[in-house]
Amino acid sequence: MRLFSTTLLIAALTLVSCTTTHVGKPREAPGPVSLICIQENSRVVIDDILDVLDQGFLRNGIETRLFSVSEPEDCSYVLTYTARRSWIGVPFMRYAHLRLLYEGSVIATATYTGGLDTNPYASNRDKLDPVIDELVSGF
């Protein structure tokens, strides 16, 4: 019984501590995505997040444009995001959530959760590139 309890505890801790990525696509994009306007989130204090997002979309053949207040009229696709960081000696990104909208309706979401990642100090690019790739796959 004790061995079973210990095994169960280790399995539970492993599941909770893993890095997870979740992508949801409630709706298909009506056509190819060539431009995504990214709404700047001034509450996110992760310095390179906009560069990481821009480069991630460019790698997938999608141009980006940044806006802070008014959504540009010629942008059908808009990305909103939030991200959080933690500290263990130095800051690192532990969570990011991306929402892709088409004409105001959510068509896809993607979330990165670091948990008790074995490498929390990996670059933000290494953490978000697979999330971005999965978010736009099939568009």
Per-segment meaning from a language model:
Residues 2-10, 16-62:
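A structural "domain/chain start" motif
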Residues 66-85:
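A short, hydrophobic beta-strand-centered structural micro-motif
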Residues 34, 60, 77, 94-96, ...:
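Envelope-exposed proteins and targeting segments
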Residues 19-29, 56, 114-139:
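C-terminal/domain-edge helix-coil "capping" segments
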Residues 90-114:
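Amphipathic beta-strand/beta-sheet edge segments enriched in Tyr/Trp
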Residues 44-49, 89-90, 119-120:
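Solvent-exposed loop/turn segments connecting transmembrane beta-strands
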Residues 41, 69, 82, 112-113:
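Active-site-proximal beta-strand/loop segments in catalytic clefts of secreted hydrolases
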